[in-house]
Amino acid sequence: MIYVKYIILGFIMGSSLNLYAANNDIIANKEVIKVEVSNEHLKTLNEASTLLISCVDFRLIDETDKLMKQLGLDDDFDKVSLPGASLALVNDKYTYWGKTIEDTIGILQQLHNIKQIVFLDHRDCGAYKMLVGQEHLDTREKETAAHAEILNKARNLIKEKFPQLKVYTFLMGVDGVVEQIYEDVTLSSVIP
């Protein structure tokens, strides 16, 4: 806290430093950092039951971890984050994202013996706005339908390529409310 105050004082005194550069210097100057291990047993674990595929959005990092804990998967999941989560797997513009997810699943089946995939999409997603289009997301109903269609497409692709894995799909609101999206949702051909 004192260091931050010093940086702010530097601004007040007319220093040419900017907060962004100062923050980067703080990070760059850390050569060794000791991070507290959350659970001692983590050192002995070599399997994770689940791969979580979620969006990169910084707004929901803590909420995502809380969800996984509520699902009983705390300390029992690997994680891949790409823009749009399920959209990353099935979009036509950035196909290498899908390849990355598929390769990761294959590797984690061997390394950690994963048994299931959890896709976690979220509302107000920038990747969906860019790749699906705002016109498909401008009401809550349309947004739910767009996510449901893409989540189900992702589920079907995983089941086709990795039939032994269970797939669960969820949609999180920026308010933290999470809805499970089931296979029987009627699709509306949102994907361009």
Swiss-Prot record:
Pfam families: Pro_CA_2. It comes from the Bacteria. One of its GO terms (molecular function) is zinc ion binding. The keyword Repressor does not apply. This is Uncharacterized protein RF_0129. Residues 1-21 form the signal peptide. Keywords: Signal. InterPro entries: Carbonic_anhydrase_sf, Pro_CA_2.
